[in-house]
């Protein structure tokens, strides 16, 4: 720890890794002077599973079902970056319909992630009612996911060159019905929460981050935009079809926990706006680039080769990564989710580096909680919005 313990009246408290307010298995060693926080040291790694090394010993096709375990509340984004990196590396074009379907799924996943941030965040502050309200809307999103992908979570829906299946009959009407219903729900949240004096007392001026600090610490997502920096990769990188829709980057200049709350509430509204435009303008055509299915040219087999030992052998699809390197990124609900990919003319990536937004955003926590009260730790930690699956990887 950074502070030498010279005073005898200081108290050291362990928060986590098993704690009802902890967002996953995070452990904080907090040094207290009464109720004032003197120092805070996060202890990470309880959920480390070696995901980068696993990626370097699998083909992209084999690895794809596993990536949903990074951020298991925004699984569409982990799938998106996993297929985007090889697509950019090999310059694979995806059909326009597939791109629109991806945008719809990504924005639905963004809303679901923000909802499951809002409920526990309010519960941390002592408000139980919104915690139950958010599950009502979140279940409707998961019903849409289940109808389109077959799974409520861990969808395994994105593919290199498109998506796994087209949208089923009647899905678009159900999606539009949800959008109309959810906009009324957001208004209900704001009436219930935003002007609540107890809520404002807990979040206003708590966990302040200036714009310069946010940039210097490498923060991204709502953490960055709440400090006055208008930076959204959907506008900056123009990936998928985001440049074909009319929407605004949500940002605030106050830089406190209230600003981060307002940014996420605004993002849910903008996501609905994007979904409505995408659903109404979705083009026809294929949902997958079928040329990519050929992946790798099969070698000429010999009669004594392994291929002929089993009559029913069906080789798994392979995708050879050329000898290049690139950095791909998407705007996930928690910030910039990136992949640094190095290929070396083999089926496995030579290097697969994950840049998780939660891991970077969590680094500023000790600075934010110093000189604050003990009860403010959960407010600040909740406003950061972390999932330990992607922090520890």
UniProtKB/Swiss-Prot annotation:
Give EC number(s), comma-separated: 7.1.1.-
| EC top class, as a word | translocase
InterPro entries from the UniProt entry: NADH_Q_OxRdtase_suD (IPR001135), NADH_UbQ_OxRdtase_49kDa_CS (IPR014029), NDH1_su_D/H (IPR022885), NiFe-Hase_large (IPR029014)
Instruction: From the UniProt record, list the reaction(s) this protein catalyses.
Output: a plastoquinone + NADH + (n+1) H(+)(in) = a plastoquinol + NAD(+) + n H(+)(out); a plastoquinone + NADPH + (n+1) H(+)(in) = a plastoquinol + NADP(+) + n H(+)(out)
A Pfam family: Complex1_49kDa
Report the record's Gene Ontology biological process terms. Answer: photosynthesis, light reaction
What domain of life does the UniProt record list for this protein's source?
Answer: Eukaryota
Offer an example of a GO molecular function term for this protein: NAD binding
Main location per the UniProt record? plastid
Q: What's the protein's topology in the membrane?
A: Peripheral membrane protein
- What keywords appear on the UniProt entry? Chloroplast, Membrane, NAD, NADP, Plastid, Plastoquinone, Quinone, Thylakoid, Translocase, Transport
Where located? Plastid, Chloroplast thylakoid membrane
The Gene Ontology CC terms held by the record are:
chloroplast thylakoid membrane; plastid
* Disulfide bonding pattern of the chain: none
Cited SUPFAM superfamilies: HydB/Nqo4-like
Q: Report the NCBIfam families cross-referenced here.
A: PRK06075.1, PRK07415.1
Family, per the entry? Belongs to the complex I 49 kDa subunit family.
Q: What else is known?
A: There is a 56 residue fragment from the N-terminus in a second position on the plastid genome (corresponds to 9311163); it is not clear if this is transcribed.
Biological role: NDH shuttles electrons from NAD(P)H:plastoquinone, via FMN and iron-sulfur (Fe-S) centers, to quinones in the photosynthetic chain and possibly in a chloroplast respiratory chain. The immediate electron acceptor for the enzyme in this species is believed to be plastoquinone. Couples the redox reaction to proton translocation, and thus conserves the redox energy in a proton gradient.
Q: Quaternary structure per UniProt?
A: NDH is composed of at least 16 different subunits, 5 of which are encoded in the nucleus.
Q: What is this protein called?
A: NAD(P)H-quinone oxidoreductase subunit H, chloroplastic
Organism of provenance = Oryza sativa subsp. indica
Q: What gene is this protein translated from? A: ndhH
């Amino acid at each position: 720890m950074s502070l030498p313990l010279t005073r005898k009246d200081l108290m050291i408290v362990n928060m986590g890794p098993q704690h009802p307010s902890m967002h996953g298995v995070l452990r904080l060693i907090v040094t207290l002077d009464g109720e004032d926080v003197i120092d805070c040291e996060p202890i990470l790694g309880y959920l480390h599973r070696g995901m980068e090394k696993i990626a370097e010993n699998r083909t992209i096709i084999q690895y794809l079902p596993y990536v949903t375990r990074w951020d298991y509340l925004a699984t569409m984004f982990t799938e998106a970056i996993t297929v985007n990196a090889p697509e950019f590396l090999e310059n694979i074009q995806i059909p326009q319909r597939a791109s629109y379907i991806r945008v719809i799924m990504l924005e639905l996943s963004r809303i679901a992630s923000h909802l499951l941030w809002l409920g526990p965040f309010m519960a941390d502050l002592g408000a139980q009612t919104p915690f139950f309200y958010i599950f009502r809307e979140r279940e409707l999103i998961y019903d849409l996911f289940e109808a389109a992908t077959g799974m409520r979570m861990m969808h395994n829906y994105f593919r290199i060159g498109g998506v796994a299946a087209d949208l089923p009959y009647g899905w678009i009407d159900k999606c539009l019905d949800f959008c109309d219903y959810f906009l009324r729900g957001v208004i209900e949240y704001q009436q219930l929460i935003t002007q609540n004096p107890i809520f404002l007392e807990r979040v206003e001026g708590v966990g302040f981050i200036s714009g310069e600090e946010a940039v210097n610490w490498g923060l991204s997502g709502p953490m960055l935009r709440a400090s006055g920096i208008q930076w959204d990769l959907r506008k900056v990188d123009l990936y998928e079809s985001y440049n074909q829709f009319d929407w605004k980057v949500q940002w605030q200049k106050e830089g406190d926990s209230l600003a981060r709350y307002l940014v996420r509430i605004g993002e849910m509204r903008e996501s609905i706006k994007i979904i409505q435009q995408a659903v109404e303008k979705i083009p026809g055509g294929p949902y997958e680039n079928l040329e990519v299915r050929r992946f790798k040219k099969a070698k000429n087999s010999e009669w004594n080769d392994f291929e002929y030992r089993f009559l029913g052998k069906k080789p798994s699809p392979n995708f050879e990564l050329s000898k290049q390197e690139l950095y791909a990124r998407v705007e996930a609900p928690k910030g910039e989710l990136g992949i640094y990919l190095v290929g070396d003319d083999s089926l496995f990536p030579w290097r697969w580096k994950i840049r998780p937004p939660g891991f970077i955003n969590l680094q500023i926590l000790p600075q934010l909680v110093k000189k604050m009260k003990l009860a403010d730790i959960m407010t600040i930690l909740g406003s950061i919005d972390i999932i330990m699956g992607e922090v520890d990887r």
